Amino acid sequence: SDLSFIAPNQNIYAVDDLSEDKQPVKPFSYSVIKHSLVGLSKYFAACWALNGVRVNLLAPGGVWNDRLNKAFVNKLTKHIPIGRMANYDDYKGSIQFLCSDASSYMTGANLIVDGGRTIGSV
């Protein structure tokens, strides 16, 4: 892979809104695109690691905003053990972690930050 457009020792992270382990309830094209992003990120992580470039994914859960349908929010929240949808601020620490030296030995990973949604509710 051509690295000419990326300086060495950089961090790249992408956002993938579902864990690759969770079956999306959307059209097949959505699933194909999301799984492709996971595969592409892992490919780049493997190819660029020796150049000091780390590539990781952040898989956030649903983010609440006041435009969301209340019935949708209630239905989704029942599947989140923490009991609420995320706020944008809930992801700041994860993004800082992925872009910092604290994750220097991490590449090709998918960091799931979803309030426990992928483990299911009790």
Q: How would you describe each model-predicted region?
A:
Residues 1, 54-64, 99, 112-114:
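Conserved SDR Rossmann-fold cofactor-binding beta-strand/turn motif
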Residues 1-50, 62:
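Catalytic loop of short-chain dehydrogenase/reductase
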Residues 8-18, 50, 57-80, 90, ...:
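A glycine/serine/threonine-rich, flexible loop-to-helix segment
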Residues 15-18, 96, 107-122:
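Short C-terminal tail/terminal secondary-structure segment
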Residues 41-42, 92-95, 99:
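Short-chain dehydrogenase/reductase
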Residues 44, 52, 84, 101-102:
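Conserved functional loop/turn residues at catalytic and ligand-binding sites
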Residues 49-54, 106-108:
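Short, small/polar-rich loop/turn modules that mediate ligand/substrate recognition or access, typified
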Residues 80-91, 102:
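A conserved structural motif in NAD(P)-dependent oxidoreductases
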